[in-house]
Every structure is written in structure tokens, then in C-alpha cells.
From Swiss-Prot:
Domain of life: Eukaryota
Catalytic reactions on record: 4-hydroxy-4-methyl-2-oxoglutarate = 2 pyruvate; oxaloacetate + H(+) = pyruvate + CO2
Record SUPFAM superfamilies: RraA-like
Residues bearing PTM N-acetylalanine: A2
Pfam families: RraA-like (PF03737)
GO cellular component entries: plastid
Alphabetized UniProt keyword annotations: Acetylation, Lyase, Metal-binding
Swiss-Prot/TrEMBL cofactor(s): a divalent metal cation
Organism this protein belongs to: Arabidopsis thaliana
Protein's name in the database: Putative 4-hydroxy-4-methyl-2-oxoglutarate aldolase 3
Residues at which substrate binds: G81, G82, N83, L84, R103
């Protein structure tokens, strides 16, 4: 995929920004994974300290998509670790954004996938299978809908209602 720059995308899409179709997430995420720059259509998940749905989703073909996980901002355990990072890479996900924590950071950093999360915590999550898929989630000051597009690079993360021509 051609490299893009989120700053450039903001400058050249002022109208989309003013009407709310292009939004920047608040700068609350840390950068993990090999891909500092990634983009794709969004699949949303809403879970709380339980990552069964995360694994189920990453076991499917990603086809260049980005999994956006609203973990409610919990800092008490990790929703994604090295195994799931590897699964995401092998199944063709371009990235994972977690409103929550990751673990096995060194392993995730070896994976060919972009990962953003609030931080890391070595504790694993529960495995009950609770949560919702393909629902609107509220992360980093913006509402994110399943099927919208995400663009991430070193400057930050953009959410766009439609695919941008970059
Ligand atoms: O299964 C988990 O809880 C997450 C994890 O450690 C991994 O992906 O390796």
C-alpha cells in the first residue's frame, strides 16, 4: 500500500473535517507493531476485560481491515498479546486499535501489523465471551462506526466516514 500522511490528509480534506466526516482521535495511544503506518476498513468490537471475541475476530480473514476494540479504557488487564498479534498478521489484518491494554509487547513489536493501545499490562483478561460486535464505539473523543475507515501513522489516528483518496 502507498504510504500516506495523516497530516496531509487533514490539510487536503478540510471540508470533511468541518462536517465531521473526518475526525482525529485524541492522542492517547501508544505505538506498537511493525507497521507505524496502516489503514483499512474498520471492524468494531465492544468488550470489557474479556478477549474471547477479539480472538474470534482475529481468527477470521482480515482482508486489510483494522480491528477497533473498545475495551472501555480498562488498564487492569490486556486484551491483545503476542499470540493474537501473530494471528492478526497471519490473517491479513492491517492493524488493531485497543481502547485498553496489550501485553507481550516485544512479541507484538515483531509482528507485521500496526497496533495502538493505551499501554501494556502483563495480566490476561477473562475468557467468558461477553461483548458486542459491529456496534458503534466511543473512543478517543469520537464515535466510530463499523465500516468507517481508519488511517494511522506516527502523527496519530484518523477516522473517515468513507475511504480517502490518498
Ligand atoms: O490470550 C490472551 O489473553 C492474549 C495473549 O496473551 C496473547 O494473545 O498471546
Amino acid at each position: 500500500m502507498a504510504a500516506f500522511a495523516t497530516a496531509e490528509a487533514c490539510d487536503s480534506n478540510a471540508e470533511l473535517i468541518s462536517n465531521g466526516d473526518l475526525r482525529a482521535l485524541h492522542p492517547i495511544f501508544k505505538i506498537y507493531g511493525q507497521r507505524r503506518c496502516f489503514s483499512g476498513p474498520i471492524v468494531t468490537l465492544k468488550v470489557f476485560e474479556d478477549n474471547v471475541l477479539v480472538r474470534n475476530q482475529l481468527e477470521t480473514k482480515g482482508e486489510g481491515g483494522v480491528l477497533v476494540i473498545d475495551g472501555g479504557g480498562s488498564m487492569r488487564c490486556a486484551l491483545v498479546g503476542g499470540n493474537l498479534g501473530q494471528l492478526a498478521q497471519n490473517n491479513g489484518w492491517s492493524g488493531i486499535v485497543v481502547n485498553g491494554c496489550v501485553r507481550d509487547v516485544d512479541e507484538i513489536n515483531d509482528c507485521d501489523v500496526g497496533v495502538r493501545a493505551l499501554g501494556s499490562n502483563p495480566l490476561k483478561s477473562t475468557k467468558k465471551g461477553h461483548g458486542e460486535k459491529n456496534v458503534p464505539v466511543h473512543i478517543g473523543g469520537t464515535l466510530i462506526r463499523d465500516g468507517e475507515w481508519l488511517y494511522a501513522d506516527s502523527d496519530g489516528i484518523l477516522i473517515s466516514k468513507t475511504e480517502l483518496s490518498v
